[in-house]
Amino acid sequence: MMKQFVQAGLVACLLAAPASAEPLAKELFGAKTTSSNEHAAPHGGYAKGCLAGGAQLPETGPTWQAMRLSRNRNWGHPETVDFIRDLSAYAAKQEGWAGLYIGDISQPRGGPMLTGHRSHQIGLDVDIWMLAPKRLNLSRTERENISSVSMRRAKGAYVNSKWTRQHHNILKAAARDKRVARIFVFPGAKVQMCKDEKGNRAWLRKIRPWWGHHYHFHVRLACPRGANGCVDQAPPPKGDGCADAERWVADILNPPPPDPNAKPPVKRREYVLADLPKQCATTLSR
């Protein structure tokens, strides 16, 4: 009888234990310090994938500096690196801007991160600081300690006095780039750009309101041509999206009452390697 009781208890403990003892994908990818020895390719989606053959954005270039170097997140698909070079060269032509300060792109082999982002996994996302660079010779220590500046007022309903026409121009140039799928920025900035744009408004479709994103804006590139393992996000709805941004602002200023029937949010499960595209196992090993 006692033996049966002990066996039953052991079975119960095993059933209660985690279904898998596999290490988390974020631990595996977060441990890699260099890119894989493969042809450059994004595998999977922006929030569930990896990056083969990633290219490292140089820490300093003619018109940019990569920030927070200790994170080792200045890796991306070569097309992303080229985009940064191009946009920063444009930014350097704006009054008061020496170029761009670049935040997180991806880890050396992409994949889930130990801290921070859910996306930025396939080398096609890049955070660009709102702070206008005055110089591009910051030391490594300065790049760890300096902070960007917030552009928002009233919890993101409006831009503040630090927002300039130069910010508008840089985001517009990014949105007009054919490589770009969408750009995330706080709602008040989108509404302000809608008010200020007097020309062709087609590019505004790519400017998407989202929570946060007032110290930086987040550029997401489309899957490069020929990247068959890459999963694009659905395109933004047709139109300039300005009315939608105004609804975001209205909800910030006058928050709707909570839904009494809303279910509590389900905690997202942490990915293991088997959850990612099968090519990611190869990317980890090379």
Positions of the model-derived regions?
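N-terminal signal peptide c-region/cleavage motif recognized by signal peptidases
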Residues: 16-18
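Active-site acidic/histidine clusters and adjacent loop/turn architecture
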Residues: 36-103, 163-172, 177-180
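Sec-dependent signal peptide recognition
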Residues: 3-11
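Short, surface-exposed glycine/acidic/tryptophan-bearing loops
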Residues: 115-133
